């Protein structure tokens, strides 16, 4: 999918996100993946404010038990969200996400990139 098309679809779907609370969990995960990819594209353009927005929407679409049922996706989104937020200059919010990640990550390998970003943000 072309970058512009992906970002266009994500932007159009934002208008309906609030209505998605009762949608099928699988659909919500698929849309969270779309927003994750959109956030990655925005990061690739160094548009951290936009990537921050996409990653926040992606995280909001995951179920409340996201650290159990969607561990890998949640970890990826959370780390990219923290990087985007940090790049926007909101160090405290980024650190808050990183501290939550340290509590939730299951392995040392998963915690290493979190620790690395946390060290650079302090």
Where are these predicted regions, by residue range?
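Extended alpha-helical scaffolding segments used for macromolecular assembly and cargo binding
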Residues: 1-93, 97-120
């Amino acid at each position: 999918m072309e970058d512009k098309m992906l970002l266009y679809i994500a932007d159009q779907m934002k208008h309906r996100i609030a209505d998605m609370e009762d949608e099928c969990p699988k659909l919500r995960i698929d849309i969270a993946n779309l927003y994750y990819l959109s956030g990655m594209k925005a990061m690739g353009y160094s548009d951290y404010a936009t990537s921050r927005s996409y990653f926040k929407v992606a995280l909001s679409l995951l179920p409340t038990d996201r650290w159990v049922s969607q561990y890998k996706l949640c970890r990826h989104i959370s780390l990219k969200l923290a990087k985007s937020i940090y790049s926007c200059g909101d160090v405290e919010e980024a650190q808050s996400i990183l501290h939550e990640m340290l509590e939730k990550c299951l392995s040392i390998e998963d915690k290493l990139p979190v620790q690395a970003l946390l060290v650079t943000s302090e």
